[in-house]
Amino acid sequence: MQDFFANCATVLQKYGFSYLRGAGTTLLLALVGTFFGCLIGFAVGALQTIPVDKQRDPVWKRVLLKILRIFLRCYVELFRGTPMIVQAVFIYYGLLQVFGIKMGMWQAGFFIVSINTGAYMAETVRGGIVSIDPGQTEGAKAIGMNHWQTMVHVILPQALRNIIPQIGNNFIINIKDTSVLSVISITDLFFVHKSVVGALYTYFESAAIVMVIYLTMTLFASYLLRLWEKALDGPQNYDLNTTDSLAYTSGMYNAPDPNHESQNLDMKGGAAHV
């Protein structure tokens, strides 16, 4: 056990900065990929839920939406049904060999994580939109909003709050799954681990260090996401005024405290007297 900690100290002394730089690369890939993946997911999810009226919509619109939905469905199933490491090899090496399309490592990395996350987020967003009470859409139409105004101002803000846990889950998954991008030579945390092992042959020690770093990043990300959820929930220490005694009986509201009310009246009376 002493040799283990001594070896870990030696590895950190020689390659500590490389581990930190690799962790920074991993976080950057996960953060940027999740952000653009969410944008893709919101766009795809919103497009998949465009309503079609067979009586009012012209034929060309119905045909166009049908083709669009088939294309989006193929995109979602393709990138959800294949491993990210295979996608990375196909996009970075395959496109260059077959079509002559050359992408830089960073461009390919961001692109791969974004479109992969977008495929998962598309279904999440679609489910979040469908879960919203249809009365919200009907009410928006009643005041003259069209479909896109309803989506932007009414539906999507509520859907966003409902799918925050899944956004956080995808971010944490991306922190771990970006390790596969070492196959295209991106110097993330796992790439650094392989380099250290190749130099020192400290498989167990280097793997332990990398696991601790990954665990620290995911736990910190989970904590920040919980804070974000609480911030969106707003304060929980207020009660709405109501004169319906049944609301107090059912537990929907807390009954006002008479002592607290009398103290408030005394304070107001004292202030008025002064």
Feature locations, PLM:
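Transmembrane alpha-helices and adjacent helix-loop boundaries
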Residues: 1-274
